[in-house]
Amino acid sequence: MIIAIDGPAASGKGTLGKRLAAHYHFRHLDTGVIYRAVAKALLDAGADPADEARAIAAALELDPERFGHPALKARAIGEAASVVSTFPKVREALLTFQRQFAAEPPGAVLDGRDIGTVICPNADVKIFVEADPVVRARRRTLEARARGEEVDEAVVLADILKRDERDRNRPVAPLKAAADAHVLDNSNLDIEAGLKAAIAIVESVRVRSGRA
């Protein structure tokens, strides 16, 4: 079974994906980490994230061992990843890796921005996570401060709105809910409530498909 979770920055899709994968004993891939790893490789090399040729090269040489690096959570890396992800050839280079991951039995949960529309259009379950931008900015600010980063919530909100605009309007694989996705608004849901709602969605699909 493949579960696709999409949504904008700081919507809670990553936490939901991780918890949902643990519940079903499936593998989990936060696809945003892939782009962050590419962005970090560029920044470490002193390259500009807007340098498309360098970004493509970094994507082709991507080392999965870099996925767990704590620095990938930094706001600067996230901003650079948002730029890198707009390049069609970068997305193409990372497509095969993501699809191979999704195909591994017994199942996988992938979260990102184009899982249900591009990476796994035939996923068994598609969930699109939404949340109010102000709520998302607050969550992202608290996460950053918990890591010891000094951040201004107003600046974080501005960054989120800018990323939303970039993600929704990029020419390749724009952020949008798949036509058959279940929309989950977790603006007012805590982690447990969000997980419970997602499990209910998955179980309803399993019942309809005769997998329950």
Curated annotation (Swiss-Prot):
Its main location: cytoplasm. It is an enzyme of class 2 (transferase). Keywords: ATP-binding, Cytoplasm, Kinase, Nucleotide-binding, Transferase. It catalyses: CMP + ATP = CDP + ADP; dCMP + ATP = dCDP + ADP. One of its GO terms (biological process) is pyrimidine nucleotide metabolic process. ATP binds at G7, P8, A9, A10, S11, G12, K13, G14, T15. CDD domains: CMPK (cd02020). One of its GO terms (molecular function) is CMP kinase activity. Its EC number is 2.7.4.25. It is found in: Cytoplasm. It comes from the Bacteria. GO terms for cellular component: cytoplasm. Belongs to the cytidylate kinase family. Type 1 subfamily. This is Cytidylate kinase. It comes from Nitrobacter winogradskyi (strain ATCC 25391 / DSM 10237 / CIP 104748 / NCIMB 11846 / Nb-255).
